[in-house]
A protein has these predicted regions:
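Short, conserved secondary-structure transition motifs
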Residues: 159-167, 241-244
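Internal helical hairpin/lid segments
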Residues: 212-303
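Metallocofactor- and cofactor-centric catalytic cores in central/energy metabolism, strongly enriched
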Residues: 1-121, 135, 143-147, 154-156, ...
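Pore-lining transmembrane helices
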Residues: 137-142, 245
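A general structural motif
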Residues: 105-107, 159-163, 182-188
């Protein structure tokens, strides 16, 4: 807890001490928030009766085993798959992708296209995961793809839309408030998160900004302001969001049903390329309909992602599941709740 005013924030937050019978449950839905909360031990500053739980905010974690097995199937067909490095460690039904041939790690969607352009004889797929910021980058990339029309490049999309999942969690889980993702909101805008029925605050990522956001949420909860929505990250987020990025997304992508780890199939929660761009849609080029996958029944990552289970309560945590040898996605990705809890747990 190496930041100023920690004791001041403890005092301010303690004004909203709650009895066990009136537990206040706040969910953070951003992997960067999860990491910061664990790093700075912010949970230790919360008053009695207030619980901060992690939600489905890690983009790599929420992609299920089926997505990994689709990548593996493409590799078996001699396709080169470009992907973000975190995906290498996410377990599928047949284990992780570590050691597989024809994989290329990229750091942006643009890197994937550049590889394809430099290797015109190589069938290249970009295994795409992420929320609105990465989706916006991919949409900008598609403008270049539309112009150049490379015949060896396609996108296997598992881009996610967070709102349908938040709506589901707000209906089914006993949540008192949401710490909303600043990076996503920089694209979608504040207004994208209206109508959830519980208080929400868009937050930045510094510890004091997170604590201030939590203070706003607790104050709103005690005042009964269920529809409160506050932008506490005004340097990066506007009410209308990034209009240019939204237009690009709408031009190239459309939402459809998508599978989320721990939540199953959620309507309108996965973005895929629109029909006019089917020539660059991996699932329209290659037959992946027969690919099947099973999640590891011992891994409880799905419960962690939906706030039903704290990482330390999983029987695999820290024993057979560690960052060096992860049994599940939440431990494999640095943005995962389990990985953050393990790295910054007491004694480490």
């Amino acid at each position: 807890m190496d930041f100023k005013n920690a004791q001041l924030w403890r005092t301010l937050l303690d004004e909203y001490n709650s009895s066990a019978a009136q537990e206040i449950r706040v969910m953070e839905v951003c992997g960067t928030h999860t990491h910061a909360i664990a790093r700075y031990a912010l949970r230790t500053l919360l008053p009695e009766g207030v619980t901060l739980i992690s939600g489905p905010g890690c983009p790599v974690c929420v992609s299920g085993a089926l997505f990994i097995e689709k990548i593996r199937h493409l590799l078996r067909q001699g396709v080169t798959v470009t992907l973000f490095g975190d995906l290498l460690r996410i377990p599928g039904t047949s284990g992780t992708l570590m050691g597989e041939r024809n994989l290329r790690i990229v750091y942006s969607p643009a890197d994937a296209l550049h590889f394809a352009l430099e290797n015109p004889g190589v069938k290249t797929v970009f295994a795409a995961v992420g929320f609105a910021p990465t989706l916006a980058a991919a949409a900008a990339l598609m403008a270049e793809v539309e112009e150049l029309r490379p015949r060896n490049f396609s996108i296997l999309s598992d881009f996610k839309e967070i709102m349908p999942v938040l709506q589901l969690l707000c209906r089914e889980e006993k949540l008192s408030g949401l710490l909303l993702p600043g990076h996503v909101a920089s694209i979608t805008g504040l207004r994208h998160f209206r109508g959830l029925g519980i208080p929400g605050v868009i937050s930045g990522f510094e510890p004091e900004n997170i604590l201030h956001s939590l203070h706003i949420l607790l104050k709103a909860h005690h005042a009964g302001k269920k529809d409160l929505l506050v932008n506490n990250y005004p340097d990066a987020v506007r009410d209308e969001g990034n209009i240019q990025a939204q237009k690009l997304i709408d031009r190239y992508f459309s939402p459809e049903n998508g599978t989320w780890r721990g939540l199953g199939n959620i309507p309108q929660s996965r973005y895929t390329l629109k029909e006019p761009y089917a020539a660059f849609d991996t699932e329209k080029i290659f037959d992946l309909s027969q690919v099947q996958a099973l999640e590891n029944p011992a891994c409880r990552c799905g419960e962690v992602l939906t706030g039903k289970l704290q990482p330390e309560s999983c029987p695999l945590f820290g024993t057979v599941c560690t960052p060096e040898e992860p049994a599940g996605a939440c431990m494999a990705s640095p943005e995962g709740s389990c990985a953050a809890s393990f790295k910054f747990r007491e004694g480490n």
